[in-house]
Design a protein with these regions (language model features):
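Catalytic core of pol beta-like nucleotidyltransferases
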Residues: 1-37, 44-50, 58-113
Length: 113
């Protein structure tokens, strides 16, 4: 029996996540102290052919977070990158805003340095 659409989607998501983990390792090797998180449709698993890749670049301070976000863009591993400090990430993912709570619920850590 052939592959189902669900099988193909799982395979494509696994391939994309594998590439993102590899790219995250390269970026984080040069940016110590940070972490990268996938969020949005690719993290939730409801992506389609038009979905972009959304990444959070999290670091101890604003300067490091911005440098990490720039490195993600330079590596071309994401379409949209948000830079947050560790404190901002913890406050937002655990706060009252339903948008950020949803991001925190489904975000997948791509790497930690």
């Amino acid at each position: 029996m052939g592959m189902t659409v669900a099988d193909i989607r799982r395979r494509k998501q696994a391939e994309r996540l594998s590439r993102l983990h590899q790219q995250a390792s390269l970026v984080l090797a040069k940016q110590p102290g940070g972490s990268l998180w996938l969020f949005g449709s690719w993290a939730r698993g409801d992506w389609d052919g038009f979905s972009d890749v959304d990444v959070l670049a999290v670091a101890p301070n604003r300067s490091q977070a911005s440098e990490l976000a720039d490195a993600v863009l330079d590596q071309e591993m994401a379409d949209d990158v948000l830079a947050l400090t560790d404190q901002e990430w913890q406050e937002r993912r655990n706060g009252d805003d339903p948008y950020w709570r949803a991001i925190g619920r489904y975000a997948l850590q791509l790497g930690l340095s």
